[in-house]
Amino acid sequence: MSDRRSIDEVMVRAAKNAKREEKFDLGFFKFISLAGHILESSCKHSEDQEDPSCLKCKYDRELKLEERPEMVFARNSLTIQFGRLGSIEFNALDALKMVCADRLPDVKVGASTVWQSARQDRIQQISEHQKPFDWTYTTHYKGTVTGCQVTPTTERIDMERLKRRDEILFSSSITLFEDELADHGIAQLLARVRVMRGYFFVLLRFYMRVDNVLLRVCDTRIVGNEFDGHVIREWQLREAKYGNLGHVDPEELLDVDRAWMHLPVVEEHFDRVSVDRERLF
């Protein structure tokens, strides 16, 4: 057996051992959280062979981005199942498919000298050697919906209910991707679920910070009740220039769980995601 094959087999075994799976049922809903190690930088099979199970090949084939984030957790996912056929899944591949692959980011800071000096080397590299792409990896991803109807709604999530200290029956948190923006900030996509008696709350949060320039948060919040055949999904984009955040403690802006509260809402959408009653059984 070649050394190469021995190494590959060790890596495969390590990947299997590193995988974590959590499941929880609440009424009509099932929650499945999967976690594993980051996407490999090279394939584990020989170049003259195709392996349908190779995740790196899948990402290379399906993503148009010139570069991927430094850390992509391709084996991580969070899924809400509605009965037999409906689901909302959060995964890195579908999220990255919504990153702009053909132009540089519009960070809405005009001719900011701070931004220009901090990123000039990266801009020049992209312009000269690569296709331009959104190196902040901003994604408006709301989840991958299967077997459900999505309709606009005037219903809103009861945020006061979520502030209650109800007993948590199940919780899970996964990272989908992360990049340090060439040491000039961070871009991060996280998914979390919290299940209480009678209801649940899911949060998908994209947090992006270009140091001393811009802060952006895209939140998808989903709330459902135990025996409802639908959930309410709220999506919000919040952002602000650092120059408008001088009144905020800088430590707050570095906290992915607190920064959003200091940012104004730029855009928001509200949906009802539902399945037919007969599909619940």
From Swiss-Prot:
Pfam families: TIP41 (PF04176). GO terms for cellular component: cytosol. GO terms for biological process: TOR signaling. InterPro entries: Phosphatase_reg/MetRdx, TIP41-like. One of its GO terms (molecular function) is protein phosphatase activator activity. Belongs to the TIP41 family. This is TIP41-like protein. It comes from Caenorhabditis elegans.
